[in-house]
């Protein structure tokens, strides 16, 4: 397969993606989404003027940009796109699928209040509290199918602490989890970092009947056979029955560390009738063990405990996914002066990431095409560490250099070789 054929097949797949994921969207809005998906990937950008430039239309660039800007204001566009992606992605979620929930943000360090709509102070990870940086909050949710290293984006919701009706970040996160649970039939194992060590989250999970793995801070009281005790004290007394070496990525580095782990039966004081397990993990050099509270009550054998430990470590790969989405499509460079447009753009970027990660990256029928896209990326750069960087870079090169977007129903530039054309249409 040559690059021209690959680019043609990619455009055809993008058309199919729009048609299948958004079957009930009006035709004009569907055409707009196709243009945005193509332009964002061809330019790896969320800046409207650059997206318009990648469309290469036979009209003034300004007119293309103005049209895209108008369509971004369509009523409930963000909800339409978010719900469509989630409805399709729910098919990847089963009983043992890890559903990772990770709050993040869009930092606008050079923006000033009044320059962009509803800018608010966001979390500063280096300081451990809300700092002086302005921006918007995100909640990113992904699914990792069992026995797979691939990641499926499910939802990426943006909000501002200054928007009308805002109550708390916790309520926003619970709204995201609730919509995922409804779409997935309450399947999956929900994984949350230490920020989820709060009654607000445990009450919700238990009330909704959802399985979870949540990392504890250690200062929470739990019920054990010998009464109420701090989680950290219970962890110190836990027998480490099993040992193994695990490999995971953290902060861009692949680490292999020896760990020891064990578990204890516990209950929450507010929910004494719900049986839980406290899984304790220790590794060399750590000051205190990692404590994971889970509903997976069978977490006693090596195999079942390993599922809990690896399930939580899978959540750390979401950090790579968030970096991929932010860097590959420059989402933090977004420049829009209406809040509704900002939310719609974030939803559209989610759909673009879903096209690259789930539509191309996970489907066996498109394995040959995805492999060629990765090879295009390798020719231009060193092999990217993260699989989806290779996909995004390859799609960018093929879209930008071979043909242009001619609409969902418009004629496409076909490969010159008839044999290649036949392959492209299979």
Residues of each region from the PLM?
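Single, function-defining residue in the core of a domain
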Residues: 1-42, 84, 108-112, 144-426
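Noncatalytic, typically N-terminal accessory segments of nucleic acid-processing enzymes
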Residues: 8, 50, 60, 113-116
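Short, positively charged, Gly/Tyr-enriched micro-motifs
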Residues: 17-79, 145
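Active-site-proximal, Lys/Arg-enriched surface segment
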Residues: 37, 65-148, 260
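Generic, well-ordered alpha-helical segments
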Residues: 43, 60, 133-135, 343
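Short, contiguous clusters of charged residues that form electrostatic/catalytic patches at enzyme active sites
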Residues: 49, 136-139, 171-175
């Amino acid at each position: 397969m040559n690059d021209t054929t690959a680019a043609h097949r990619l455009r055809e797949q993008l058309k199919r993606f729009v048609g299948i994921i958004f079957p009930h969207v009006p035709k004009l809005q569907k055409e707009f989404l196709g243009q945005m998906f193509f332009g964002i990937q061809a330019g790896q950008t969320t800046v409207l003027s650059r997206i318009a430039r990648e469309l290469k239309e036979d009209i003034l660039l300004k007119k293309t940009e103005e049209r895209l800007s108008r369509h971004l204001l369509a009523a409930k566009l963000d909800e339409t796109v978010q719900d469509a992606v989630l409805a399709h992605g729910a098919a990847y979620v089963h009983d043992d699928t890890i559903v990772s929930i990770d709050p993040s943000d869009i930092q606008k360090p050079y923006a000033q209040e009044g320059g962009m709509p509803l800018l608010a102070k966001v979390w500063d990870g280096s300081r451990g509290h809300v700092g002086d940086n302005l921006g918007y909050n995100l909640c990113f949710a992904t699914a990792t199918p069992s026995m797979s290293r691939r990641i499926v984006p499910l939802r990426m919701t943006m909000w501002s602490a200054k928007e009308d009706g805002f109550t708390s970040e916790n309520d926003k996160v619970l709204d995201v989890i609730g919509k995922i649970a409804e779409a997935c039939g309450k399947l999956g194992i929900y994984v949350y970092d230490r920020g989820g060590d709060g009654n607000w989250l445990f009450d919700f999970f238990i009330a909704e009947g959802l399985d979870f793995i949540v990392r504890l801070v250690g200062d929470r009281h739990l019920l054990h056979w010998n009464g109420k005790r701090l989680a950290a004290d219970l962890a110190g007394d836990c027998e480490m029955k099993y040992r193994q070496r695990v490999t995971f990525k953290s902060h861009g580095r692949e680490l292999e560390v020896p760990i020891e782990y064990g578990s204890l039966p516990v209950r929450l004081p507010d929910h004494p009738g719900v049986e839980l397990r406290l899984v304790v993990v220790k590794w060399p050099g750590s000051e205190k063990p990692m404590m994971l509270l889970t509903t997976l009550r069978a977490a006693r054998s090596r195999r079942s405990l390993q599922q809990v430990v690896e399930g939580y470590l899978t959540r750390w790969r979401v950090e790579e996914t968030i970096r991929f989405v932010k860097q590959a499509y420059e989402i933090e460079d977004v420049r829009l002066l209406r809040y509704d447009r900002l939310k719609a753009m974030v939803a559209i970027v989610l759909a673009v990431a879903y096209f690259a990660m789930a539509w191309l990256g996970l489907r066996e029928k498109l394995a040959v095409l995805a492999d060629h896209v990765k090879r295009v990326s390798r020719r231009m750069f060193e092999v990217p560490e993260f699989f989806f960087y290779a996909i995004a870079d390859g799609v960018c090169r093929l879209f930008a250099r071979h043909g242009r977007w001619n609409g969902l129903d418009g004629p496409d530039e076909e490969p010159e070789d008839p044999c290649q054309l036949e392959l492209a249409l299979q």
